[in-house]
Design a protein with these regions (language model features):
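Short, small-residue-enriched loops and turns at beta-alpha junctions
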Residues: 14, 28, 46-49, 85-87, ...
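Well-ordered secondary-structure scaffolds
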Residues: 5, 17, 28, 68-69, ...
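General beta-strand structural signal in soluble alpha/beta enzymes
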Residues: 106-110, 132-135, 150-153, 197-200, ...
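Acidic, glycine/proline-rich low-complexity segments that act as flexible tails and inter-domain linkers
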Residues: 1-88, 307-318, 434, 440-441
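Phosphate/diphosphate-binding glycine-rich loops and adjacent basic-rich segments that engage nucleotide
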Residues: 144-193
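Alpha-helix C-terminal capping segments
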Residues: 47, 93-107, 187-192, 224-228, ...
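A glycine-rich helix N-cap at a beta->alpha junction
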Residues: 123-149, 219-225, 229
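Glycine/serine-rich anion-binding loops at beta->alpha junctions
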Residues: 77-100, 104-116
Length: 441
């Protein structure tokens, strides 16, 4: 079958068979389909859409384009969690130890940060000595011994997705729901877990800017997972403003440890407890109320923090820094960003804050950029707070020559007003195979 005919079929609104999708995807991976042909096909998908069955089949083809991880050497239900990304999104470092402390195996592969969103692997590597590239044997042995390991994603997983994503990024086809869903779920299916909790962030700091868009994406991903025999649920969480106060690698590790010690910010703690509760429900640990009580208990008795330390120790990390934050690498300098007027903060754009932290050296503008683990931002005033002119909004950490550009970027997302804005929900909805439960109405 000719790729030309398949592009034309989708351009005209046709529905692909599985064999046709295999020809397109596998042809692209092995070089028989050119970039310009794949770009044309993906634009046709963007404009014409796909049926749910088509998207499920595309996902399966993409998953099988690389290594399919077999987690069967690890007994019991394995639960994974995936976030669609955001600013200050440090939830994995909190919920993985909570769920593991409750007796559920977590064998998780995570990514690095790119653009305004941070990556779990970068945060972990800010703890001196931490290894995130484990062999499969080491990975399985660690999960079987302590119940928890978080490592970098293997280069061999869903190889079609890597090529397709790079092309989508430069052809204005990133924000296509079937292509986003197949990209995320192909990696999750290939990673081998039995159950998957999706954290679909929504708002200025997220991929999906509206709740309705986020629910549409979540429903499709839940349907794909269910189609492939996995237990899947999705939470729609707010990313108009960052979670917690800290943005940056070692700064976010410190804040995550505070949550595990029972003294973290209220918003971050609550979202993490809800995520952990739903992961425990997916692992058949009990009712939502029972699972919530379990999650709260392992924070209260210190076992979740202890589990986190065990993970870092097993992967070579210096766990002393998790108790004594002064042992982390020190930033070169700090800078106070001051309010320019009196008023309520109506908007504190999460994407702009994330971009400002990248300018300080906490993130990457392009793949392979080095990171300053100590760089970042600590927020003192968030959306809804009243500020006086001259009051500190945030503290920047990094090299002094980067402060001016970062301050300009941060301020471009600030809006002041005379009336306090309504508080946004932390969680908008829960999506399962049985339907959508809205919390914001």
């Amino acid at each position: 079958m000719r790729i030309y005919d398949l592009i034309a079929k989708k351009r005209d609104g046709g529905t692909h068979t599985r064999e046709e999708q295999e020809a397109i995807v596998n042809g692209y991976v092995n070089g028989e389909v050119a970039d310009y042909q794949m770009a044309a096909w993906m634009m046709a998908v963007y404009l014409r859409g796909m049926t749910d069955e088509e998207t499920a089949e595309l996902t399966d083809v993409m998953a099988h384009s690389g290594v399919m991880v077999d987690l069967s050497p690890i007994p019991g239900i394995k639960v994974d969690k995936h976030s669609t990304g955001g600013v200050g999104d440090k939830t994995t470092l909190v919920i993985a130890p909570i769920v593991a402390a409750c007796g559920v195996k977590i064998a998780k592969m995570s990514g690095r940060g790119l653009g305004h969103t941070g990556g779990t692997i970068d945060k972990m590597e800010s703890v001196p000595g931490t290894r995130t590239a484990l062999t499969q044997e080491e990975f399985f042995a660690q999960v079987n011994k302590i119940g928890l390991s978080v490592i970098g994603q293997s280069e061999g997983i869903a190889v079609a997705d890597k090529k397709m994503y790079a092309l989508r990024d430069v052809t204005a086809t990133v924000s296509c729901i079937p292509l986003i869903a197949s990209s995320i779920m192909s990696k999750k299916l290939a990673s081998g877990s039995d159950a998957i909790l999706l954290d679909v962030t929504t708002g200025t700091g997220a991929f999906m800017k509206t709740v309705d868009q986020s629910i549409e994406l979540a429903k499709l991903m839940v349907s794909i997972g269910t189609h492939h025999g996995r237990h899947v649920a999705a939470m729609i969480t707010d990313m108009d403003t960052p979670l917690g106060h800290n943005i940056g690698n070692s700064l976010e590790v410190m804040e995550s440890m505070d949550v595990l010690k029972g003294k973290g910010p209220a918003d971050l703690t609550e979202v993490c407890l809800q995520l952990a509760t739903n992961m425990l429900v997916l692992a058949d640990k009990g009712t939502p109320a029972e699972c919530r009580a379990m999650a709260e208990a392992v924070i209260a008795d210190g076992s979740a923090f202890e589990k986190c330390k065990q993970m870092f120790a097993a992967q070579g990390g210096d766990t002393r820094v998790l108790d004594d934050y002064s042992l982390f690498a020190k930033p070169a300098a700090s800078y106070e960003l001051l309010a320019e007027q009196d008023g309520y903060i109506i908007q504190n754009d999460a994407e702009k804050i994330g971009s400002a932290s990248v300018l300080l050296g906490a993130g990457r503008q392009k793949k392979g950029d080095p990171l300053d683990f100590a760089a970042g931002i600590v927020l003192h005033k968030k959306r809804g707070a009243y500020v006086h002119k001259g009051e500190s909004l945030a503290t920047f950490y990094g090299a002094p020559d980067k402060f001016a550009a970062a301050a300009e970027e941060y301020r471009s997302g600030l809006v002041y007003g005379d009336t306090q804005p309504e508080e946004a929900p932390l969680v908008y909805a829960l999506v399962t195979k049985d339907g959508v439960e809205r919390y914001d109405r």
